[in-house]
Amino acid sequence: MPNAVIDIPAASAPEAEAHFAASFRFETDCWDVHDTLSRPDAGFVLLDVRGPDLFAKGHVPGAINLPHGKIIASRLAAWPADTVFVTYCAGPHCNGAARGALRLARLSRPVKIMTGGVTGWIDEGFVLDSGQPGA
């Protein structure tokens, strides 16, 4: 009987290791972002790539609002070229974080996505900020 889970064989252990190890170069999670933001120098810039209205309703504390469609070289000039950016959007149902990350990568900027976005942040029990910091 066909089985959607195992009809396609699992990757070999070395292939799986390489795949999952590489994934950490592209993404981080809400817990790690929260933990790192509690330190004096987080070492990255957190970008909320949603629109300003959604940002104003609630965003991750310390995030800067820069909608993914407005990520251009001149908006990034304030940060050194080796600055790591972490993008997030509404959640797993939203591709805004990937759109923002793609724009940053095309501008030769190091970037990761915060998986889960706002939904993941809330699911972890973290609080959103409704202040108005911005770029």
Where would I find each of the regions flagged by the language model?
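Catalytic cysteine-centered active loop of the rhodanese-like fold, especially the PTP/DSP P-loop
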Residues: L76-I122
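Short amphipathic alpha-helix with an adjacent loop that forms part of the alpha/beta core around
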Residues: L37, I72-A81, A135
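Short, hinge-like loop/turn segments at secondary-structure boundaries
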Residues: I64, D82, L128-Q132
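Short hydrophobic/aromatic-enriched beta-strand-loop microsegments
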Residues: A63-K70, S108-M114
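Short loop/helix-cap segments at secondary-structure boundaries that form the rim of catalytic
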Residues: F55-P61, W121
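Hydrophobic/basic alpha-helical segments enriched in Actinobacteria
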Residues: A42-G43, I71, D82-T83, T119, ...
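Flexible, polar/low-complexity N-terminal or interdomain linker segments that lie immediately upstream
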Residues: M1-K57, Q132-A135
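Short active-site oxyanion
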Residues: P40-L46, P61-G62, V84, P110
